[in-house]
């Protein structure tokens, strides 16, 4: 018998290190997956702690994504529990990581251009 979580319990798991979503009344712990999400972590972070069914279906995920999702399943949502609003998680930490990556990419690109110009 799967564990059953209230909407409140799921809503409490919307932080960067402890991150759950609901899809088709099933609860998934995507904490370890969000950084690997092909669409970027910002997309999935906007849905933390809440029902992501509509967004998930609208995107049209692959069979591989559906298989991966099965491995992240931790239980079902109690549909009789009261729905709650979820406070959005700040993605400033993620944005600063992204801008650091951009700096590295630009530095490598500049080195490549300098190397090309010096060896002409």
UniProtKB/Swiss-Prot annotation:
It comes from the Eukaryota. One of its GO terms (molecular function) is metal ion binding. One of its GO terms (cellular component) is endoplasmic reticulum. The chain crosses the membrane at residues 98-118. GO terms for biological process: sterol biosynthetic process. Residues 2-78 form the Cytochrome b5 heme-binding domain. Keywords: Electron transport, Endoplasmic reticulum, Heme, Iron, Membrane, Metal-binding, Microsome, Transmembrane, Transmembrane helix, Transport. Its main location: endoplasmic reticulum. It is found in: Endoplasmic reticulum membrane; Microsome membrane. It is a single-pass membrane protein. Membrane bound hemoprotein which function as an electron carrier for several membrane bound oxygenases. It plays a role in fatty-acid desaturation and is also involved in several steps of the sterol biosynthesis pathway, particularly in the 4-demethylation of the 4,4'-dimethyl zymosterol. Present with 5390 molecules/cell in log phase SD medium. This is Cytochrome b5. It comes from Saccharomyces cerevisiae (strain ATCC 204508 / S288c). The gene is CYB5.
């Amino acid at each position: 018998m799967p564990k059953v979580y209230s909407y409140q319990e799921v809503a409490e798991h919307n932080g960067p290190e402890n991150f759950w979503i609901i899809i088709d009344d099933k609860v998934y712990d995507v904490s370890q997956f969000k950084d690997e999400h092909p669409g970027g972590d910002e997309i999935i972070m906007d849905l933390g702690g809440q029902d992501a069914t509509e967004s998930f279906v609208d995107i049209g995920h692959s069979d591989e994504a559906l298989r991966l999702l099965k491995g992240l399943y931790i239980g079902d949502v109690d549909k009789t529990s009261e729905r709650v609003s979820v406070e959005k998680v700040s993605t400033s930490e993620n944005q600063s990581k992204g801008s650091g990556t951009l700096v590295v990419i630009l530095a490598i690109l500049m080195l490549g251009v300098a190397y090309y110009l010096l060896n002409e």
